[in-house]
Amino acid sequence: MAKKKATKKTAKTEAIEVIFSFDTTGSMYPCLTQVRRNVGNMVKKLFKQIPNIRIGIIAHGDYCDEGDPYVITMLDLTDDEKEITNFVKNVDSTFGGDAPECYELVLYEARGFSWSSGKSKVLVMIGDDIPHTASYAGNTKNLDWFRWLHGFHSVYFS
C-alpha cells in the first residue's frame, strides 16, 4: 500500500482589529499597574502571532472625571507597536468616585474608530463595574449600552 505524502496546510489567519478598553478609576489602579508593566510584551506577541492586526486603545474614567483629567481618551486603530505601548504606559489615572462607570460611552466611542471593512471587530473591556443606565444624569447622550454592542464580532468583559 502506497503511503500518502503529507502536505503542509497553510493556516488561514483571520483579518482582525482589536480595541482594548480599560477602566482607569481608583479601584482599577492595581490592574492598571499590571497593564502598564506588561503591555510591551503583550503587543509584541499579538503582532507576531496575528499578521496585519491593528490595535486601538480606550482608557476611561467616569463622567465625574470630566476635565480632571478626562472621561475618556483614545488611540485609534494602528499597527504601530511603539505608539500603542507608549499610549498605555503614559495614560493618566482617573478618580471615578462612584459606581457604575461609563462603559456605555466606551461602546459608543468604539464605533467611531477607523475600522476596516471585511475585518472582524473585537472589543476587550477591562473593568470592575457595570455601565450606567441611559437615564443616568451624567450620561447626557442617554446611551443604552446594550444597543452599542451590535456590530462587533466579539465583545469581552473582564
Where is each model-derived feature located?
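Divalent cation-coordinating acidic motifs and surrounding scaffolds
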Residues: M1-S158
